[in-house]
A protein has these predicted regions:
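Active-site recognition of the HExxH zinc-binding catalytic motif
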Residues: 88-100
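Metalloprotease/metallohydrolase-associated module, dominated by Zn2+-dependent proteases
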Residues: 1-80, 100-169
Length: 169
């Protein structure tokens, strides 16, 4: 299920598996009174001394390394999710790993590491239904509406065709 939007991640993982790790949570989280099924975070330890050492050790115990980014998903949801729902959740979380680009859309590389500069990206469209109802759609909502008029690139058939279990079974 290749997505060129994530090539910057795939290229890093090819050379350095420590860029990204995945973890299962035993249940969903609740944030702002909404169920959260997945979360992408840039791994940072905002503590000192032994707390930082313990947190780093926990990551090494879990993954064998301390990742730069961690995606955690609700195992209970994933267990019952359709292939499409699961793939969409993972894809959503991967979109939170943004890559800095210049005005021409080219990836910006770090002068120190030579690697692409990444950041934790917010959502493309963050708006309330009531706000749009009252004031109308802003440019990002209008763009989303135009995109939504087209059929999705990925269908159920595409997902089944790329799944090792489905192809073998």
């Amino acid at each position: 299920m290749h997505n060129p939007d994530h090539d910057h991640i795939a290229e890093l993982l090819h050379d350095n598996e420590e860029f990204l790790a995945f973890a299962w949570a035993s249940s969903a989280a609740v944030a702002k009174k909404r169920m959260v099924l997945g979360q992408c975070e840039k791994v940072m330890f905002n503590v000192g001394g032994w707390k930082k050492a313990r947190q780093e050790q926990q990551m090494r115990d879990w993954f064998g390394f301390v990742p730069q980014y961690l995606i955690t998903v609700d195992a209970t949801f994933c267990e019952q999710a359709s292939d499409r729902e699961f793939c969409r959740l993972i894809e959503h979380e991967l979109y939170h790993i943004g890559v800095e680009r210049d005005e021409d859309g080219e990836i910006i590389y770090s002068d120190h590491t030579g690697l692409p500069k990444h950041y934790l990206a917010g959502h493309d469209v963050e708006v309330f239904f009531g706000e749009t109802k009252r004031w109308g759609a802003d440019e990002s909502v209008k763009r989303l509406l135009e995109i939504a008029k087209n059929a999705p690139f990925v269908s159920e058939t595409n997902i089944a065709a790329c799944c090792g279990n489905c192809v073998i079974g």
